[in-house]
Amino acid sequence: MSETTHPTFAMVAGELSGDILGAGLIKALQHQYPDARFVGIGGPRMEALGFESIFSFEELAVMGIVEVLSRLQRLLKVRKTLIDEICSIEPACFIGIDAPDFNIGLELKLKARGIKTVHYVSPSVWAWRPKRIFKIAKATDMVLSLLPFEKAFYDKHDVPCTFVGHTLADDIPLISDKTAARNLLGLDADAEYLAVLPGSRGGELKQLAEPFVKAASLIKKRYPDIRFVTPLVNQKRREQFEEALKLHAPDLEITLVEGHSREVMAASDCILLASGTATLEAMLVKRPMVVAYRVSPITYKIAKGMMQIDQYSLPNLLSGETLVTELIQENCTESLIADAISEQLDSDFSPLKEKFMQLHKGLKCNASERAAEAVIKLIQ
């Protein structure tokens, strides 16, 4: 292994957001190491840069405690195979990108075998299950955090952490172009649009497609001229959403788009979306939003007992105040969603837009380059 000129970086990315972060990090590392090898689990953006996937990253796209338990045997088998493969490769370091319940355990095993480990995207230890910090301390040589308030938490526990900012804040312009987004998507330049984003995972659509399309039907009755547009991550999710549409709102017209979720948000006047990274994107494109989310009752009951926070969306967590409406679990109903969207459509968005702008500027730090610098410093 030649770490100085031709290093191998092992990586595991969970979900689309991890694929985006992984691709940015690979690009930044390739500037320093043009002949580096990247191997593990990654998505299409990472693979387009030469990443070698041992397993499909769909393997890790599991939501909820109950849902994870149902696939636990498969996940453990994937992790064992990865440990063997990565140890045989002897990488300069391993970088786990998000997916903490999978990656932290993997990092623990790899670090015990002498491989340097980095965890990119801090688990929400400040939000729930705070005692995970002790396992993270054992498992990682460095945590790369995306959010500014996270580093103080790690410093308090003497865990090496570097705040790098967020690649989405770097990629999305401070002022998003609604007209350009509509032209790209072939949407009406003058119509009012509500973007409906029920999530990227099958489990999310199973929980959210019904209340989202029912809410859209109610909104259509209140605002007859409004139009709807929904991005779906792939054909499988599109078919799943179309099934829900047919079942719960057969007369509702929604423009369906494969991919282009960011452009859909930029093209919209208001956004209804699932909790998660998408709430950050919605904030960064400066659009009013309503966040709604639910999981299985058992998952929620277990998770609720471990939560340290009472807000879930990133705009609210970053600001420390309630900037956006959150409708969680039993509040995730079509009537409450429709009321919240109506309030956004009828309100002056200017003060909130300015707050979103300030939050955007605080996260815009050339994250991929800063993350790469931290990794390079670790392996040199």
From Swiss-Prot:
Keyword annotations of the record: Glycosyltransferase, Lipid A biosynthesis, Lipid biosynthesis, Lipid metabolism, Transferase
Function recorded in the entry: Condensation of UDP-2,3-diacylglucosamine and 2,3-diacylglucosamine-1-phosphate to form lipid A disaccharide, a precursor of lipid A, a phosphorylated glycolipid that anchors the lipopolysaccharide to the outer membrane of the cell.
Catalytic activity, reaction form: a lipid X + a UDP-2-N,3-O-bis[(3R)-3-hydroxyacyl]-alpha-D-glucosamine = a lipid A disaccharide + UDP + H(+)
Underlying gene: lpxB
CDD domains, sorted: Glycosyltransferase_GTB-type
Protein name per the record: Lipid-A-disaccharide synthase
Matches recorded under HAMAP family: LpxB (MF_00392)
GO process terms (BP): lipid A biosynthetic process
Family under the similarity heading: Belongs to the LpxB family.
Organism (species): Shewanella sediminis (strain HAW-EB3)
